[in-house]
């Protein structure tokens, strides 16, 4: 037995019962609030409209936030709510200290924060440090060359060719296509923008700017929030000038000959620079200032679409801790509608193998930048993936609507408003548009799915909302939402909170894992990725389990046994594209620790 302060979560490798290599993952016996947290992302424009303008707002969130507590959520993360011209829907901030008027007032925010505190929900805000809006006062002052703001952004005079013609400082390409450099007539220099030209990059090689952004964090921490999700981290730093010049990036050799496409280059100079990790550590020091005051842990969650070894590096080290939760996007980037059980296991192990010792895993299946689970991975597998999300060891993150299996809504070119898509053309915009995954939340079968009473909403409500909505699923005997709620409730039991973890694949398509606590019992989770029903060889895969009769805790809708019934695992067959959670208690102490 390990000491009480340490539990081993054993990840068994291989495709059979032939041995395993254990991977120890530290868990404190007395869990901190976030260590087994269930987090939920709200996209504020799309959650609930309280004033009838067709746009979600803070009062709407406050009015409906009890729903999140009801479905078993611990922490809520809000996408940006700060003052913005909305060229990138809040990721272009013109005042880091003010609330966007469409969303409400500072008083509305404080009311929301108080409501969250009163019902035990932890509130997380987006922090967008890479850039501001070009309408930010600091950019205006920087463009005019006024100190101390002159070097708050990244400026360069460019390069003169033999004919005296001025060109951008380097060949760097924006994430949103085209040159990452924009000429300013006022300053007579180029400024860097890794995203839109209206989103100039901040200069983190300027200590005054670094302190400015730390003060932004302190302002919101003083409002009582529990932490930050930090946006677009790989772009925070670029390589430094060499002899007054920036190095060009090499051609990628990928399947594009479009020089405006960011995939045209390999981003050796503009992504994943080593200084980024130290900056995250500095931000961790800021939130730790507040933790030290009252012994309530404030957390950092990081967003970085990059190689897994870079993602996990954001955990930091014992000497220089970083993010408690560097988002794990492996289940998003590595899985498709055609993925097999082995593909799923490979995605899981790609993260657990890369994690540093003592770190806590997290699992993310969707967000505002990626197609919804039901559309990307298959409607039939929506419950299967939510079962996995809630039963794998570690932290779970759910994007609004995934609990009811919302789907992407097709949006025409004429109605498209996402800048990533608008920078493309009618033939290719769907490859880039994120509008389909940001449609209004489907509360009911009423007007605009209960989201708003406006004549027109900011994005159209998805087709099929009359059948697919919260009210209908709460009323149904079985539903995606009720399965989700069964899972979140059971997740708080010791078997899922503390249980050792042994993972198996059976053939190509059946995944099984066992979570167990000595003296308490065990849980077996089975996920059938195959096209045919699958038997569950529990006894052979997990020697020592003994009993063949197990209690059903939750299952996919197409799986027949309902929660609370018992099945004989020797006889039962799990339906295709389905998951099931089975329990056997051997003791009585399965309550939360």
Swiss-Prot record:
Keyword terms, alphabetized: Calcium, Glycoprotein, Glycosidase, Hydrolase, Metal-binding, Secreted, Signal
Calcium keyword on record: yes
Protein name, per record: Salivary alpha-glucosidase
Pfam entry (one): Alpha-amylase
Gene name per UniProt: MAL1
Tissue: Saliva (at protein level). Proximal lateral lobes of the salivary gland (at protein level).
General function of this protein: Functions as a glucosidase that shows high activity toward sucrose, a major component of nectar. Assists the mosquito in its sugar-feeding capabilities.
Subcellular localization: Secreted
Residues the record lists as binding Ca(2+) 1: 49, 51, 53, 55, 57
Cellular component terms (Gene Ontology): extracellular space
Residues bound to N-acetyl-beta-D-glucosamine: 338
GO biological process, one term: carbohydrate metabolic process
Documented EC number(s): 3.2.1.20
InterPro entries the record matches: Glyco_hydro_13_cat_dom, Glycoside_hydrolase_SF, O16G_dom_2
Sequence positions that bind Ca(2+) 2: 130, 201, 235-236, 238
Catalysed conversion reaction: Hydrolysis of terminal, non-reducing (1->4)-linked alpha-D-glucose residues with release of alpha-D-glucose
Endpoints of the signal sequence: 1-19
Top enzyme class: hydrolase
Residues bearing carbohydrate: 130, 163, 295, 310, 338, 414, 445, 453
